[in-house]
């Protein structure tokens, strides 16, 4: 049993969570919050048609020059289609921008160059008139804005593609943040999703590249994630759940905003306002005078505890969602995405950590999990038997296990076998020899077949590994900032 998530060092604030604390937290963890599953509304032909006209014009504008160039060069290169797709997403906004953000945050899945290109996609949106915000809140809460809040700032403190956030004060004097879904956002997202999937399928057919296939494979999980985000009761329940859970283990530097259920509903979420700066704002944090490495280490410990022991975790821990507070604590905000590990991903993560702690028996389990999910690809690309696979996985993963935390890449550790398989069967994009052209055409045919026959849908294991590895990459960055010597 992994009781101490991060081994203690002379200056470490990491601590062994006691058996009593774990027992109490286990009871709460079993009460995983019910999700209000929201199926996107059915869209009309007219809605799809209007949006398709806009999308077609944007695609023609962005991909026209690219296709002309590819016809001259007899191939569509990554340097051509990736920037064109990113600009297309930026022009179309809303759902497309959110998908672009997903690509930009996952170099382990899409490759460093592709992720770098999409990193400029910012999830933002236009202002919502205050009268409209007021109407939305009053419709959701069934009372006037003045009855709900003593003061409500009409100027938003945050504007994303699906919601806006305002600051307010309750009649009890509490400072709160109020998240409000944009008007008609569900229908706009539903129409976009109906058109995004065919667009990604066309990109796969045109390029045959693994990065394009990976985008299409992540679409189903993206659709599911948006369905959860469009009902703020899901986020409220997740916050209450983790607030209780982390309150039972002694990690005092980690805080979750308190939810005000009487001021929350499907389209409105009222929560404690957290004053702070993003965890990567080193200059401001240094001025707070807190021992930042100790604080960040407890956040990492909290994340690993929830993911390793209970298989659930915050699914979007970018720096803006980890607010370093002036009092030396970190507030973890924006619980719209919560990761839930399927049984195999949960076991894989635990066994990898146990392998890192010296359990040699873990490698056979790790190899067996990868064989279950990637057996055919491993056999075709690497031609390894069971013993060879175990040795290969150890060779890929073991070097990172003895490095200081700030130099460890847990995400690379999770994704190493998949990357190696892809590399072993990959094609040099810069090679224009006749043989390589033939191989590229063959890969394109395989990609088209995947789209037509299977829909290129990722498994629960793929999606869970993807979401977990994304968060680990963020924590690696914070580790390099604050704990490179731990």
PLM regions and their residue ranges:
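Core structural elements
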Residues: 91, 95, 159-162, 262-273, ...
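ATP-dependent phospho-/nucleotidyl transfer catalytic cores
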Residues: 119-126, 138, 186-191, 197, ...
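Glycine-rich ATP phosphate-binding loop
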Residues: 167, 175-182
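Helix-rich C-lobe and terminal helical cap/extension of kinase-like folds
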Residues: 18, 34-49, 73-75, 79-80, ...
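Residue-level signature of catalytic and energy-coupling elements of molecular machines
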Residues: 100, 165, 178, 235, ...
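Conserved ATP phosphate-binding architecture of protein kinases
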Residues: 163-171
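N-terminal accessory/targeting segments that precede structured cores
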Residues: 1-164, 187-217, 223, 425, ...
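Residue immediately N-terminal to the catalytic "proton-acceptor" Asp
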Residues: 168, 310, 315-320
């Amino acid at each position: 049993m992994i009781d101490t998530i991060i081994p203690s060092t002379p200056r470490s604030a990491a601590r062994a969570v006691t058996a009593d604390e774990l027992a109490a937290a286990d009871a709460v963890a079993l009460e995983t919050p019910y999700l209000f599953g929201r199926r996107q509304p059915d869209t009309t032909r007219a809605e799809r048609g209007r949006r398709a006209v806009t999308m077609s014009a944007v695609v023609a504008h962005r991909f026209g020059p690219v296709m002309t160039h590819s016809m001259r060069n007899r191939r569509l290169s990554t340097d051509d289609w990736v920037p064109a797709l990113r600009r297309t997403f930026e022009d179309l906004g809303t759902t497309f921008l959110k998908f672009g953000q997903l690509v930009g945050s996952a170099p382990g899945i899409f490759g460093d160059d592709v992720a770098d290109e999409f990193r400029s996609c910012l999830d933002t949106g236009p202002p919502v008139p205050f009268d409209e915000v007021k109407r939305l809140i009053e419709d959701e809460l069934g009372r006037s804005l003045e009855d709900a809040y003593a003061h409500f700032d009409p100027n938003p403190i945050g504007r994303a593609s699906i919601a806006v956030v305002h600051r307010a004060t309750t009649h009890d004097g509490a400072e709160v943040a109020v998240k409000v879904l944009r008007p008609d956002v569900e229908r706009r997202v539903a129409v976009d999703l109906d058109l995004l999937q065919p667009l990604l399928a066309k990109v796969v057919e045109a390029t045959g590249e693994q990065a394009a296939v990976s985008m299409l494979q992540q679409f189903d999980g993206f659709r599911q994630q948006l369905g959860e985000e469009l009902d703020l009761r899901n986020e409220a329940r997740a916050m209450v759940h983790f607030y209780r859970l982390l309150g039972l283990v002694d990690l005092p530097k980690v805080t979750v905003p308190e939810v005000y259920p009487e001021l929350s509903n499907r389209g409105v979420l009222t929560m404690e306002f957290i004053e702070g700066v993003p965890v990567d704002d080193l200059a401001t944090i240094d001025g707070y005078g807190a021992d930042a490495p100790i604080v960040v280490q407890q956040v990492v410990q909290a994340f690993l505890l929830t993911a390793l022991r209970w298989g659930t975790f915050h699914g979007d821990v970018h720096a803006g969602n980890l607010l370093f507070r002036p009092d030396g604590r970190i507030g973890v905000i924006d619980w719209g995405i919560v990761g839930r590990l399927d049984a195999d991903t949960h076991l894989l993560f635990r066994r990898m950590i146990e392998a890192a702690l010296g359990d040699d028996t873990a490698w056979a389990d790790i190899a067996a999990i990868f064989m279950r999910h990637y057996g055919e690809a491993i056999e075709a690309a690497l031609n390894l038997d069971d013993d060879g696979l175990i040795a290969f996985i150890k060779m890929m993963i073991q070097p990172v296990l003895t490095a200081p935390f700030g130099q460890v890449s847990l995400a690379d550790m999770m994704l190493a076998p998949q990357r190696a398989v892809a590399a072993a069967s990959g094609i040099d994009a810069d090679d224009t020899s006749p043989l390589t052209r033939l191989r590229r055409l063959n890969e394109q045919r395989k990609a088209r077949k995947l789209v037509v026959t299977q829909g290129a849908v990722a498994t629960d294991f793929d999606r869970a590994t993807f979401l977990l590895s994304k968060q680990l990459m963020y924590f690696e960055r914070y580790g390099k900032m604050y704990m490179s010597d731990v």
